[in-house]
Amino acid sequence: MAHSQNSLELPININATQITTAYGHRALPKLKEELQSEDLQTRQKALMALCDLMHDPECIYKAMNIGCMENLKALLKDSNSMVRIKTTEVLHITASHSVGRYAFLEHDIVLALSFLLNDPSPVCRGNLYKAYMQLVQVPRGAQEIISKGLISSLVWKLQVEVEEEEFQEFILDTLVLCLQEDATEALGSNVVLVLKQKLLSANQNIRSKAARALLNVSISREGKKQVCHFDVIPILVHLLKDPVEHVKSNAAGALMFATVITEGKYAALEAQAIGLLLELLHSPMTIARLNATKALTMLAEAPEGRKALQTHVPTFRAMEVETYEKPQVAEALQRAARIAISVIEFKP
């Protein structure tokens, strides 16, 4: 005959870290209370529940309205590493939504997060980098990071996170969009030297993102001068032979800006850039062809470059009449080809 017996063990399918959330509209207010609990396990469980809820933009909006963001800011200073990890996870999920990015800006989360840049937990730092990467997808987010003076810190972290290549990618993604807004602080933080080192990475994503960052650095005159001064151009030219199309495209884009100044033109000519850029005109990537055309146009402004490109005018004439599926792509490439021809055929 069977006997009933109460076990002292939890059922095998019960997760002790999960919290029972209140029903309906009471769920978030209840979690807000538990985020402020003095009991460590209660705080941890509330954060785990929030990690699930914050995938819903409506929940982010409600959480922001009842003051959860201030509670999360406070938990970034918690002495328990798991609390900090789960708090940064909630925040990076939040930053992946437009309403969440607005919450970041409204509640000054960017600066609060920055105090964890040197957190001993790599998971915590990884969540932080992902949150910043999500935030800069809008110009206001990039401007916020710049205004808080965090660019130099991110440049430094790009150097020291050598064991975590994924973290380097997150930081580079963040820097690319920040540099597009303003490269002043970065240029004062040796960003060109740091990016030069990353161009030599064995990781193709890091090489590509570093070249893209240098493209944005080179928009300003000071950036162009530093790229020339630190001998970055020969490395960019070498990357035109990279097996990865994105790397070649971004390297050509960086050269396109760096060769605007005379020093850049002659550095690229000395590095034999013309032949490699001409090969890139046949790339399957439209942006690579456009970048290469514009870079060659810059080199044609130098007498030596113009002379070397004289025999390649038919290539550009073919681009002028080439058809593409997208009208805007056709217009951009055809216009770039026309300008290249006019510069190459210019008679001083």
UniProtKB/Swiss-Prot annotation:
Q: Which UniProt keywords apply?
A: Cell projection, Cilium, Cytoplasm, Cytoskeleton, Flagellum, Repeat
Q: What is its main location?
A: cytoplasm
Q: Offer a single GO CC term for the protein.
A: radial spoke
Pfam families for this protein? Arm
Where, per UniProt, does this protein localize? Cytoplasm, Cytoskeleton, Flagellum axoneme
Under InterPro entries, the record lists:
ARM-like, ARM-type_fold, Armadillo, RSP14
Keyword Translocase recorded: no
Tissue specificity as recorded in UniProt: Expressed in adult cerebellum, spinal cord, spleen, skeletal muscle and some/5 out of 9 rhabdoid tumors. Detected in fetal brain, lung, liver and kidney.
Q: Which family does it belong to?
A: Belongs to the flagellar radial spoke RSP14 family.
Name assigned to this protein: Radial spoke head 14 homolog
Q: Which organism is it from?
A: Homo sapiens (Human)
